[in-house]
Amino acid sequence: MKDLSKYAGIIPAFYACYDEKGDISPKAVRELTQYYIDKGVKGLYVGGSSGECIYQTVPERKLLLENVMKVAKGKLTIIAHVACNGTRESMELAAHAESLGVDAIASIPPIYFHLPDAAIAKYWNDISSAAPNTDFIIYNIPQLAGVALNPSLLATMLENPRCIGVKNSSMPVEDIEKWIHCGAKVVFNGPDEQLLGGLVSGATGAIGGTYGAMPEVYLKIFELAKSGKDLDKARELQQDACQIIYKMCSGKGNMYAMIKEILRLRGAPDIGGVRAPLYPLQPGDEAIAASCAADIDAAIAQFCC
């Protein structure tokens, strides 16, 4: 029987860490990993959207994961997103991830061409076959991938004993209930703005792109939701988190550029900027980041101490 409790908790999506030349910084990767260990998160989701994976080469993605694992192995649950445009490269990353001892691999569906469900299932199962001793998680993010998971496709995938569930980043909370009803053993809430709703609907844990900027806030929401002792407080804290997210997105630069500045302001390691074509911080964005950092600290002081 698999131990699925390791997936129950707050799992920040790990950010790309670059040096002054824009190359992967192994040192910054290790430092950021330790930062999250010290914050008390359950795990890390490495190589996903928040990690700018689609703008990185296969060797770069390997290097980043290797340095996460140097620090995190045995301390955090590590889920490695391994999808590439092609099946061959995705399988290469899957095999590499398993060799490092990750807890699970994950994959979006094939992008650009709209493929039938049978082709999507084959893509996922081929990737899973390259990591035969590792859990597999479907990443459902239709607003970016261009294709949505459906009950029939999930049923097909659950015939693969390694497929344990879904990282669900579609917006309806209803989808979380749907995948649970379909037999998924593990379902992660994806949209950060609906963490509380996702947990109340039965999500096992949560993976989010803004969790890394304010892990204390999301850890408290998770604690309150799972205990059921003070849902009013959880709801108020979720509303604060949403307002901070909206402010993060109000700048001219990409949200992840904003988050990296917020991390610096909050004492986290300097992990560089974002990789083009993602838009870097623009004049005026630093003030927004400072305001977000102040709001995060205020929420922590009010709810998390």
Q: What would you call each of these model-derived segments?
A:
Residues K6-C17, K39, V200-A203, T210-C305:
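C-terminal alpha-helical cap/extension of soluble enzyme domains
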Residues E52-C53, F113-H114, E174, L196, ...:
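Short secondary-structure capping/turn micro-motifs that flank functional sites
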Residues L93, L100, F188, A293-I296:
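A short, hydrophobic/aromatic-rich structural module that often spans a beta strand
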Residues K2-A148, L263:
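Active-site beta->alpha loop and helix N-cap motifs at the rims of alpha/beta catalytic domains
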Residues S129-T134, I141-C242, M248, K252:
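Catalytic alpha/beta core domains of metabolic enzymes, predominantly
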